[in-house]
Each structure stands twice: as C-alpha cells, then as structure tokens.
C-alpha cells in the first residue's frame, strides 16, 4: 500500500534540508528551540527517533465554565518557546526537524477571546523549523510511524502524554526523555541567562520600591500588593512562586503565604518574592527591619550571622565545587554564630551538626537550581541527598547523609543556583526539639528570647562562570537596604 506523505512535517531520509538563519533586530530574541532540541537529543545519546511533547491544555475549574490560569508545561516550553495553550511538538532526531502544532482557527473563540497563535506569529517567536495546525498532527504521526515500521522509538515524558496512534507496531519510550531533558536544562544558554537576568532586574525594582515605602505600610498584604504592582507595571504579570511576606513570628514559617497580618509591633519581615520573565524564574529573599535601623540587638546579630553564611558560600562558588560542601559550610558558620549568642552550647561543631541541632534553626537546603522552574530540574539533586533530602525537614531535624552522598554533582559553568541560608526561631520547632536527644546542645531559655524576631533569610541567584560566579540578583541588602529605608523616611 502506498503511504501518503505528510503535510509539511517530516523530511524524508532521501531529502536534504538547508537551513540558513540571519540574526538581526528583534530576531535575536527568538527562542532557541532548535538548539535545545539538539541538546536533548545529544543527552539521549541517540541518532534517530521522534520526541513528542504535549503542551498545557485549556482546563476549566472543577464544576465551572471558567478556565484555570494558564501555565505552560516547562518541558514543552524548553523545546518550543511557545507560551500558548493547546499546542503540540515533534522533533525528528535523524532529520533534525522540529515541528510545532498550533490550535486550529476557531472563529467563535476568536470573536470572544481573540485569535489563537498563528503560524506566522509562532515563527517570529521561536526558531522551530515548521509550524502546522493541529489538524495535521494525527496524519503526520501516522505517516512517521508507518514509514519507520516500529524500528525507531517515540520518546514521551509520561504515559499520559503518548500519541493516540492506532498501530500495533508503535514503539514508545517513556523512560529516557525526562532525564535527558533534565540534564539539558541544568546548563543555561545565553538566551536563558538574559531572561533570568531580566526577571531578577524587575524583582530588584520591586524589592527596592518596598524598601522606599516600608515606613508607610501597615500590613503584610500591602507589601505583597506593592511587589505585584511593580512587577506588573514592568511587564512581568506572573510570579515565579507565591509571594512570602511574613512578619514577626511568621518569618519563621518557611512558606508562609497568607500575608494577612498587621506589621504593628513586629521587628522584621521576611520577603521572599521573585518575578517571572518569559517563563524564566527569579528567586529572591530579603529580610527587612520594620524600623529605621535594627529594632533590637538580637535582630541585628541574627542578620549578621546569616549575612556571613551567605557571603562566605557565594565567595566559594566556582566550577568544580561540590554544592554539598557549601551546605556544610553554612551550617558550620551558623553553629559558631549561635554559639557566640549562647543559643547553642560550646560543644564540638561536628557533634552539634551530626545531632541535627543546627537544623532546628536552619532546616532547609542552602539552595537549588533556577530556570524555567523556580526549583529547576537537574540530572541529580544539587546536594546529592536524593531520597534522604526530605530528612532535612523531618520531625527530628536530623540531616541523614549517607556515605553515597559524597558522590556529589559538581557545580558547572552555566548553572544558576540560589544561595539562601536562613536562621529561624520557630516556636513549634523549638518545642519539638526539647523532646529530642539533640536538646542537650540547645539553650532553650536563650533561644526563646529570639522568637519575636521570627527568622532571617537572604537569597540571591548565582550564575556559575568559567572563572567564578556572577550574582544575578540586584535587590538591595545589608547596609544598602538600610540606607534606602532611611532615605524613604527622610523624603516622606
């Protein structure tokens, strides 16, 4: 039986494709989808097969005719650069052909909601080879599978995203694509770094605006709304994650997002907020005094300990460094700082660390990758804790590190990681710690005096470079932060 050829989708093996790209003007902002597709194929280590990805579909809320806010699937975006719903993508590895499928034109939808993405618009946004309407997808997939007679696999991320092809000879591989894409995404290219820099730039503006106006604010909600307003006014309508604006004891809740309490009588506010730019994240945390200066000596002292933790860890970032070593360094500095404040006993720092006592005050990891996700993917966890990673936050607060943890992934050029140490005085955590063996290392009477402070966290996004690092975060901190607060009061 003669097999009909597809509508403009896959180059036959006996054809030759010549692609010539001229970069000029706004074309420099085209998403490098083709480069990413080739990178994923290289990580797969194969010379043939078809990568098949499904974009985020339009989905309504349960029992409602109202759509949920759209958020593109990040793996799909990595190979397409298209931030529109109901799209599909194929990449023929042997033919080196990347094809995007956009929704068919729907007049009724166009009248009510505006037209969907056109073929011309898609080509302007991304350097995909071809763009077709969705109506061609099924035919093109069947053509490809029939031509290859089940001798080459179709790579999918999940079983739920496999193509609906009526073929008994279909070879699906749902195991290899995800780790290959994770390995590709962990190293950022120049386009991605521009997006992350812009996200950080807008976040920096929003953090600075809050410092200028903090003396006028009376609630956590005002801080959140100010941050959002600055981001939206600069074109960043989406946040990388829910804004955390925790004042007082709320600053000791790592992912506090209620942001609905008054600031009156509070010493500090922990503001963890980062804008998103073209699907790329920023992740920025600043701890802000609600006074013209530090409201108490205790608040100042804790800030200085966390500041030292961050500065020393950032200073050591370079290609080839084990991130886990920075995690250990941060704990070592935290332990010594808390010993000086008589919060921890003067026992050996290694004994205190191994007991888990320092994790009562610093219960989370030092950082993570940043990219299309705020907690971006990688081939292996950055601290190599793997399945034990959850133990940083277990009820005993004991960081269970096995011998295998020493086989740690190294930092490499092009990675973007956060450095976000923190020290917290969480009432529930301290109460729980009193019943643990680690209690002998903690002076609870002294620690409880710090509960009104809540906690201090400082977080920057750091690019690993060939010779060291570049701090991508522009939000003020330390003495610069205090100067802006003072000027805001003087100018009011």
Swiss-Prot record:
Mn(2+) 1 binds at residues 283, 420, 459. Belongs to the peptidase M24B family. Keywords: Aminopeptidase, Hydrolase, Manganese, Metal-binding, Metalloprotease, Protease. This is Probable Xaa-Pro aminopeptidase AO090005001240. It catalyses: Release of any N-terminal amino acid, including proline, that is linked to proline, even from a dipeptide or tripeptide. Binds 2 manganese ions per subunit. GO terms for biological process: proteolysis. SMART domains: AMP_N (SM01011). Its cofactor is Mn(2+). Pfam families: AMP_N (PF05195), Peptidase_M24 (PF00557). It comes from the Eukaryota. It comes from Aspergillus oryzae (strain ATCC 42149 / RIB 40) (Yellow koji mold). InterPro entries: Aminopep_P_N (IPR007865), Creatin/AminoP/Spt16_N (IPR029149), Creatinase/aminopeptidase-like (IPR036005), Pept_M24 (IPR000994), Peptidase_M24B_aminopep-P_CS (IPR001131), X-Pro_dipept-like (IPR052433). PANTHER family: XAA-PRO AMINOPEPTIDASE 3 (PTHR43226), XAA-PRO AMINOPEPTIDASE AN0832-RELATED (PTHR43226:SF3). Catalyzes the removal of a penultimate prolyl residue from the N-termini of peptides. One of its GO terms (molecular function) is metalloaminopeptidase activity. The keyword Protease applies. The keyword Manganese applies. Mn(2+) 2 binds at residues 272, 283, 459. Its EC number is 3.4.11.9.
């Amino acid at each position: 039986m003669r097999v009909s050829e597809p509508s403009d989708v896959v180059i036959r093996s006996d054809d030759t494709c010549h692609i010539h790209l001229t970069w000029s003007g706004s074309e420099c902002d085209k998403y490098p989808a083709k480069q990413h597709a080739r990178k994923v194929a290289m990580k797969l280590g194969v010379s043939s097969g078809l990568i098949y990805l499904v974009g985020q579909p339009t989905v309504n809320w349960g029992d409602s005719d109202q759509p949920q806010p759209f958020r593109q699937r990040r793996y799909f975006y990595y190979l397409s650069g298209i931030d529109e719903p109901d799209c599909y993508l194929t990449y023929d590895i042997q033919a080196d052909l990347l094809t995007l499928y956009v929704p068919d034109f729907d007049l009724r939808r166009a009248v009510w909601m505006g037209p969907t993405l056109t073929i011309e618009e898609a080509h302007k946004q991304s350097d995909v080879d071809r763009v077709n309407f969705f109506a061609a997808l099924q035919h093109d997939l069947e053509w490809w599978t029939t031509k290859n007679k089940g001798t080459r696999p179709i790579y999918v991320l999940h079983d739920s995203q496999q193509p609906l092809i009526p073929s008994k000879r279909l070879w699906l591989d749902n195991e290899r694509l995800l780790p290959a894409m994770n390995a590709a995404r962990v190293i950022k290219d120049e386009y991605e770094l521009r997006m992350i820099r812009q996200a950080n730039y807008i976040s920096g503006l929003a953090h600075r605006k809050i410092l200028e106006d903090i003396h006028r604010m009376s609630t956590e909600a005002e801080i959140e709304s100010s941050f959002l307003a600055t981001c939206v006014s600069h074109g960043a309508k989406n946040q990388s994650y829910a804004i955390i604006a925790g004042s007082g004891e709320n600053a000791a809740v790592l992912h506090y997002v209620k942001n609905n309490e008054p600031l009156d009588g509070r010493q500090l506010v922990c503001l963890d907020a980062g804008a998103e730019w073209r699907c790329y994240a920023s992740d920025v945390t600043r701890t802000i005094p609600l006074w013209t200066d530090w409201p108490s000596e205790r608040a100042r002292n804790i800030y200085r300990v966390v500041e030292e933790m961050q500065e020393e860890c950032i200073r050591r970032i370079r290609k080839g460094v084990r991130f886990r070593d920075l995690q250990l360094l941060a704990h070592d500095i935290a332990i010594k700082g808390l010993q000086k404040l008589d919060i921890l006993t003067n026992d050996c720092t290694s004994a205190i660390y191994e007991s888990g006592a320092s994790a009562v005050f610093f219960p989370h990891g030092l950082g993570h990758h940043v990219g299309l996700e705020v907690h971006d993917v990688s081939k292996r966890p950055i601290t190599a804790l793997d399945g034990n990673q959850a133990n940083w936050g277990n009820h005993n607060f004991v960081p269970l590190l096995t011998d295998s943890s020493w086989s740690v992934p190294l930092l490499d050029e092009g990675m973007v990681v956060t450095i976000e140490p923190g020290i917290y005085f969480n009432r529930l955590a301290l109460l729980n710690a009193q019943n643990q063996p680690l209690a002998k290392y903690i002076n609870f009477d002294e620690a409880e005096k710090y509960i009104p402070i809540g906690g201090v966290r400082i977080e920057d996004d750091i690019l690993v470079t060939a010779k060291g690092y570049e701090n991508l975060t522009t939000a003020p901190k330390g003495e610069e932060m205090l100067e802006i607060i003072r000027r805001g009061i003087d100018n009011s």
